[in-house]
């Protein structure tokens, strides 16, 4: 068994209380960081909001709707503080929407290929995009800001069946984009890999896979990458038949960690010695983040405070924070910088 503590992965932990003004209130959702700003967006539909790094509300980003300068569902977003830009990529992506740090619409960038549910990166006047290889001709491509296609990767070698769903994620430091076919409620499983897409190379580079030789069937699985490790989770799908239909849920059976340096692997347990329960989906782009309502944060801190072995400094920090949390507070943003 391999054990890691959150403090092994992050060098610091910051808890930011958001402004409680009525127009600043948010639910949970995405957290995107820069040196002086927080860009917060809903999990699905809704408006993106810009805050200062101290939690002060600055502005809404654009407006919610179906108009040419508006949006409803956003698949991905990027905060570019140095160039006074915010990029929002709608779920049905025909154009990339560009706003300034005052939340005002600047322009839109036509996309060379119409795709849905993409992830994107804007850098040096170029846009790189990735999507799930499901009924699409291209899985990754790069273009300029005028919509001219610069390179692309065919989806054919990576295609998944309609019953499968893929997943795509950024690397921690946006040095590349990573892609893997994580499966959920699928009709069949298959041998697959975690890939890196390096824009301009016209290909995906495989970085990690698992040999399931000897097993009767390949199990449900998802691959992850963070820091010095690869991680893969094995699941079983539980199907329940009800009068209203057939429902499936995913149950984790094993979590296995692989050290990149020595390739040693073992059953993995994560110990959060800083804040409570870990949410793995929140490791991204060089940070560990949480977007928590006041009641949720208070419960996490109270549970952690009951544990033995906490340093006096850690316990005092938690007590001080607990004493400031009020029921009617806006959300709290937790930020841990990856080592």
Regions found by a protein language model. Name each.
Residues 73-74, 89-138, 149-163:
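Asp-box/WD-like beta-propeller blade repeats and closely related beta-sheet repeat scaffolds
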Residues 205-222, 254-286:
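Conserved blade-ending motifs and adjacent loop-strand segments that build the rim/top face
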Residues 139-146, 190-197, 246-261, 329-337:
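Beta-propeller blade signature
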Residues 34-43, 84-90, 125-133, 173-188, ...:
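Short beta-strand elements that form the blades of beta-propeller/WD-repeat-like
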Residues 27-30, 71-77, 114-122, 160-169, ...:
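Repeated scaffold domains used in trafficking and secretory/extracellular systems
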């Amino acid at each position: 068994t391999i054990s890691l503590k959150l403090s092994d992965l992050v060098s610091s932990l910051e808890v930011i209380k958001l402004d409680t003004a009525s127009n600043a209130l948010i639910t949970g959702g995405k957290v995107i960081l820069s040196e002086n700003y927080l860009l917060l967006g809903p999990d699905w539909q809704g408006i993106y909001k810009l805050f200062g790094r101290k939690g002060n509300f600055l502005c809404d980003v654009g407006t919610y709707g179906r108009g040419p300068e508006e949006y409803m569902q956003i698949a991905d977003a990027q905060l570019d503080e140095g160039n006074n830009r915010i990029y929002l990529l709608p779920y049905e992506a025909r154009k990339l929407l560009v706003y300034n740090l005052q939340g005002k619409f600047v322009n839109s960038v036509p996309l060379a290929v119409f795709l849905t549910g993409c992830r994107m990166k804007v850098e040096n006047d170029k846009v790189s995009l990735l999507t799930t290889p499901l009924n699409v001709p291209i899985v990754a491509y790069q273009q300029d800001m005028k919509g001219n296609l610069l390179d692309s990767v065919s989806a054919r070698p990576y295609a998944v069946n309609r019953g499968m769903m893929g997943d795509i994620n950024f690397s921690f430091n946006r040095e590349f984009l990573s892609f893997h076919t994580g499966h959920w409620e699928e009709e069949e499983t298959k041998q697959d890999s975690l890939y890196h897409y390096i824009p301009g190379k016209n290909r995906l580079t495989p970085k990690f896979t698992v040999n399931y030789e000897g097993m009767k069937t390949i199990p449900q699985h998802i691959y992850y990458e963070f820091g010095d490790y690869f991680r893969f989770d094995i699941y079983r799908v539980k199907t329940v038949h009800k009068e209203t239909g057939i429902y499936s849920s995913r149950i984790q059976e094993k979590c296995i960690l692989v050290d990149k340096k020595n390739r040693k692997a073992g059953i993995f347990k994560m110990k959060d010695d800083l804040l409570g329960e870990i949410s793995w989906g929140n490791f991204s782009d060089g940070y560990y983040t949480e977007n928590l309502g006041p009641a949720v944060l208070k419960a996490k801190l109270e549970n952690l405070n009951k544990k033995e072995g906490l340093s006096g400094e850690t316990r005092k920090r938690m007590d001080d924070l607990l004493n400031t949390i009020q029921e009617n507070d806006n959300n709290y943003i937790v930020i841990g910088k990856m080592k």
